[in-house]
Design a protein with these regions (language model features):
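Short linear sequence motif anchored by a di-proline
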Residues: 1-104
């Protein structure tokens, strides 16, 4: 996943994509970055729910947040293995992009 994304769809637009209703509410955001709490869609007891989750993992040996995993090794790495098998979610997004620091 890229380092930034936006979500401007409203609840009605998301509900049109799913067979059962999604409960919850959220404002549009155009610059969601690691460390923030974006909205995700999770499935519990055959119902979809909107939840906010913290984006990123703190690893003691690293200064930056870990924000993504390689699909080829996600089921092998200790940090991601259990999460990948048990705690999946959908991350709704209208766009994604990498931040450019060249002019700073």
């Amino acid at each position: 996943m890229c380092g930034r994304f936006s979500l401007s769809s409203n609840l009605e637009e998301l509900q049109n994509e799913f067979s059962n209703e999604i409960s919850g509410n959220f404002p549009a955001k155009y610059n969601i970055s690691p460390g923030q709490s974006p909205v995700v869609i999770s499935l519990k007891k055959n119902n979809f729910y909107l939840n906010k989750i913290h984006w990123g993992f703190r690893v003691p040996k690293l200064t930056k947040l870990v924000i993504n995993a390689r699909s080829e090794t996600i089921n092998e790495k200790p940090l991601f293995k259990n999460l990948f098998q048990q705690n999946r979610c959908l991350i709704p997004a209208n766009s994604w992009f990498e931040w450019n620091n060249e002019n700073k």
